[in-house]
Amino acid sequence: MGNITAKLVKDLRDKTGAGMMDCKKALNETEGNLDKALEWLRKKGIASAEKKSGRVAAEGSIGSYIHTGSRVGVLLELNCETDFVARGDIFQSLLKDVSMQVAACPNVEYVSIDEIPEDVVEKEKQIEMGRDDLSGKPEQIKEKIVEGRIAKRLNELVLLSQPYIKDSSLTVEDLVKQAAAKIGENIKVRRFTRYTLGEGIEKNQMDFAEEVASMQKN
């Protein structure tokens, strides 16, 4: 692997407008070759998508997805810049795919890391700091281990960080950026709600016993 310097990352950011982590990943994937890293970002749809990310996305559409068996349902708001794009096939296909992703990810609660409340982050930190396998370790090492574990846990709660269900080499964020690059507009997942049949309803023991008995008869 080539030597990935801060200057190399900065040069790639200046050329593409992509985020620092995306630039680092691109350079790592291409062994520090700037031209190949630029091409890698373009193939991922990141280079041009990042330049659009600051533009206002106030149009869009609210989509719904009901999973087979009608036991899980999703409502999701996806925003773009114009009504014309919102009606297009690429946008509508993305809306459906991201809604399906939410249905497949029961632990996801937030769109992005930025949405996670500070008290949730602090709670996760306290849980990790109190784990038995960290006892006796120097404080500095403990902090680094906890930081890594918290980052992993928080990413599990975030929609944009999830591996795309149809192609695990992409994240949902990559998928959105690719669509933004194709249509030439900023696209944002604004919010979503996931419904599970019977969620929050406590079944009594008789209902459960009857279900088991019925299954045995069949």
Curated annotation (Swiss-Prot):
Keyword Nucleus found: no
GO cellular component: cytoplasm
GO MF annotation list: translation elongation factor activity
Organism domain of life: Bacteria
Chief location category: cytoplasm
Tagged with keyword Cytoplasm: yes
One Pfam family linked to the record: EF_TS
InterPro entries reported in the protein's UniProt record: EF-Ts_dimer_sf, Transl_elong_EFTs/EF1B, Transl_elong_EFTs/EF1B_dimer, Transl_elong_Ts_CS, UBA-like_sf
Keywords, ordered alphabetically: Cytoplasm, Elongation factor, Protein biosynthesis
Involved in Mg(2+) ion dislocation from EF-Tu, as annotated region: 82-85
Localisation per UniProt entry: Cytoplasm
Reported function: Associates with the EF-Tu.GDP complex and induces the exchange of GDP to GTP. It remains bound to the aminoacyl-tRNA.EF-Tu.GTP complex up to the GTP hydrolysis stage on the ribosome.
Listed HAMAP family: EF_Ts
Family that this chain belongs to: Belongs to the EF-Ts family.
The name this protein goes by in its record: Elongation factor Ts
